[in-house]
């Protein structure tokens, strides 16, 4: 019985150590979500004309914390842009973390 308990504790510990933590982003899931972002953020030198003309930032290589904070601010209304507010409203905290992990891991060269 004692041997079985030790094995169970060992197996659970190994599982918990290898599993991603809550709130950590998964770049693979982020890649899938990022396909909706590519239409604007994936075009070099793209400028939007709505609601005003300005250059759309490239996201590859951005700090994960910056991306999460920006998306949270769009979702809360602290940052204003109609398209981004609408998109951020559909994202969960995990979606934001996944997107941030993907873009954080994307090389700066991919931003050019």
Q: Residue ranges of each PLM-predicted region?
A:
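Bacterial N-terminal signal peptides that target proteins for export
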Residues: 1-9
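Sequence/structural segment immediately N-terminal to covalent heme-attachment motifs in c-type
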Residues: 24-48
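Short cysteine/histidine-rich zinc-coordinating motifs and their immediately flanking basic loops
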Residues: 49-55
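Extracytoplasmic/secreted proteins, especially bacterial periplasmic and envelope-associated proteins
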Residues: 29, 66, 83-86, 98
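N-terminal signal peptide c-region/cleavage motif recognized by signal peptidases
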Residues: 14, 18-20
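C-terminal capping alpha-helices of c-type cytochrome domains
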Residues: 76-79, 87-112
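A structural feature that tracks compact, well-ordered secondary-structure segments
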Residues: 56-58, 68-75, 86-89
């Amino acid at each position: 019985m004692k041997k079985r308990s030790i094995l169970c504790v060992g197996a659970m510990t190994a599982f918990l150590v290898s599993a991603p933590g809550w709130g950590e982003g998964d770049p693979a899931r982020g890649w899938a979500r990022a396909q909706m972002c590519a239409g604007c953020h994936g075009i070099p030198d793209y400028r939007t004309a709505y609601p005003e003309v300005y250059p759309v930032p490239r996201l590859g290589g951005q700090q994960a914390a910056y991306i999460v904070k920006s998306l949270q601010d769009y979702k809360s209304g602290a940052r204003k842009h109609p398209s981004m507010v609408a998109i951020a409203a559909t994202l969960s905290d995990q979606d934001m973390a996944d997107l941030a992990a993907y873009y954080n891991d994307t090389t700066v060269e991919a931003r050019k």
